[in-house]
């Protein structure tokens, strides 16, 4: 059993102890006369601050995902959630975090921004996790472990047994980024938050929910952790427009499911097509809305596509990804366009 209070930064513990609890009678209602927040009475409905607990959106999300509202925190994109993990748990210049490599670069970026030592352990050639190696990289100052499953840029799910070893073998917080989990039909760790009091699961409306523009991230964890996020978050950090668009997406979840089915079919078609391209050496298995392809001349192919107005991610400078491109699954028309161009590609050698 982890001691959550010992993991939290001292100044954050002091902030939480001083946090004011809003009395139930002071809950704001649109039917009330509200003269407490120095708002302008004109330009309704945009003159009022948004709901600070986002309860309507959380209730709909909880029903869909099979969790309680007290196990959900909504963030201004996943980036805010990542940053908050550092600010809540990691003491600058003292603590460190350990992540897998390669993975999402945001974990490293926000470690640097918060002056936290960032360590990493290399995945194997199949982009799989070795729990023992990850845990060996930890010391008494390691507060967070970062896992991403499905991972980026590789696209694969991490081995469940190895992830479980990490969760059971680490006394700090294990963060599992499941931004792309909606593209797999397998069980997610979000469904298992009751098992692991030291686990935080991240998700987002940017990927499967096709709502990147509204900047809405989701944190799932046991209530003890979520209550900390609630107490230290910025006030009114989720705009009313974002909350409304999030609710609208949830109401149209059957459309989302149809889009996912189409994307999964397109992913299968694209991978098969890439495997037959003369310029492609290998395509790695994917459980996301993208795939990683090892090319014979990645930089040349990348430049060629850019000249034609098609943007992909060049990954040659990423560990284990030499000569690789990461390709997002687009619409059928977009996918046909890139395949047509690559079939016409001429080697520069």
What are these regions (language model features)?
Residues 161, 307-308, 317-349:
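PLP-dependent enzyme catalytic core of the Aspartate aminotransferase-like
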Residues 4-7, 91-147:
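PLP-dependent aminotransferase-like
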Residues 112, 129-140, 153-174, 178-208:
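Active-site pre-lysine segment of PLP-dependent enzymes
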